[in-house]
Each structure stands twice: as C-alpha cells, then as structure tokens.
Amino acid sequence: MPKLSKRLAGLASKIEDRVYEPLEAIALVKDNATAKFDETMEAHVRLGIDPKYTDQQLRTTVALPNGTGQTVRIAVVTRGEKVAEAKAAGAELAGDEDLVETIAKGEMEFDLLIATPDMMPKVAKLGRVLGPRGLMPNPKAGTVTIDLAGAIQEFKAGKLEFRADRTGIVHVRFGKASFTAEALLQNLKTLQETIDRNKPSGAKGRYWKSLYVTSTMGPSVEVDFSALQDIEQGS
C-alpha cells in the first residue's frame, strides 16, 4: 500500500476513529485544509443501489444555496440566433456544427456542455468523447434545453449535475474551504435533500450507507448522515 505523506499522516492523526456530527465534521475538514490554495470541499456518499439496473440509477442536479466557489466554463451547441444568445448569457463557447467538429477532435476547453434539442442528433455522435468525461447533455440534468440563458445562469450560480458511479457512490464538490462552516453545512444539507428526493424507484434496503467529507488535499471525515437528515434547513 502507498504510504501517506508526513503532512497527510499528521493531519489524519487529528481525526478520531468515529462518526462526527455534520457541523463538527465540516469544521474539522476546514481546519485540516492547510494547502497553499483554497481547497475544494467534497462529499462522498455511498448509497445502497446497483446502477447496472436502470431503476437504481441516480443522475440529477442540485442548486447549492451558497454556490461552489468555482468558475464553470460552459460550452453550448446550438444554431442560428441561439448562438449569440448563449454568448450573451455568459457561455465561454457557443456554436453549431463547427463546435461539434472541434469537440470531436478532443478539444474540450469547458466544464459543462449544454445543447438545444435540435442539435442533439449531432451531439449524440460524440458519445465516445463526451461519455467518459460525463459531459453528454441530458434533459434530466437540465443540459438539453431551449432556455439557454436560464440554464447558463443557474449553472454559473452553483447548480451542479451529479450521478452515482458504477459502485453506487456519489462524488460532489460542495464549496471551498474558505466558506464558513455554516455555509458549507447549508450546501451539504441541500445535497442530502436532493439525493433523498431523487431516490431511485428500484432502491432496496438501506438507501444511505455512509457519508464522508474531505478537502482536495486533506483526510476524510465520516459524517453522521442521520443527524444531517434530521437538520431542518434554516436552523
């Protein structure tokens, strides 16, 4: 097994082998985020689902009330007047067949791809390039739409798409270490509510199995997800 760096081992030694209350866990991760940059806060949720079955797949979006603290580069595949509309709304890239050809070459200087419905037949051919990166537009995720301005505004403000991976784990960034613990807790609570609200119809047995929070360069801390579920938003 690879050895922990001295820095990470030192930080990990501060964490007790127990489950922490949500706010306590967040505060501990913040205290351990000592890198020379503003570390991203991440949540890792293990769910009792088997995504190989279609009725146990989870893919949706969450609008974090305090944003992510990250700049999202958006590309839009559309045509006609919609190209100018997308650029005016803040998209870094917007175009029609030319943009599709650029993406097909593997040139993807963006974090999110939005498409209008009329362009999806062309975008669908990019599955080999977009699929592995999780960038294929999807109506459920709000990335296939005619309301480009609204979608761009929402994703720029902190709306995130997420899905459970093949092992049933959800990985979501929910802010920066520079956020207050209270702001991070609000974001984490909103994520929990979204996961519960979108529970797959085929999920059986215990839905939540574990929840860990961590930062980019820090150790992970296990969170009492039941305590998180019991929190009333705004309390």
Curated annotation (Swiss-Prot):
Keyword rRNA-binding: yes
A UniProt-annotated Pfam family: Ribosomal_L1
CDD domains (UniProt xref): Ribosomal_L1 (cd00403)
CC annotations in GO: large ribosomal subunit
UniProt xrefs under SUPFAM superfamilies: Ribosomal protein L1
Keywords: Repressor, Ribonucleoprotein, Ribosomal protein, RNA-binding, rRNA-binding, Translation regulation, tRNA-binding
Statement: the UniProt record of this protein carries the keyword Ribosomal protein: yes
Family note: Belongs to the universal ribosomal protein uL1 family.
Record function comment: Binds directly to 23S rRNA. The L1 stalk is quite mobile in the ribosome, and is involved in E site tRNA release. Protein L1 is also a translational repressor protein, it controls the translation of the L11 operon by binding to its mRNA.
Binding partners and assembly: Part of the 50S ribosomal subunit.
Entry protein name: Large ribosomal subunit protein uL1
Organism field: Parasynechococcus marenigrum (strain WH8102)
Species lineage: Bacteria, Bacillati, Cyanobacteriota, Cyanophyceae, Synechococcales
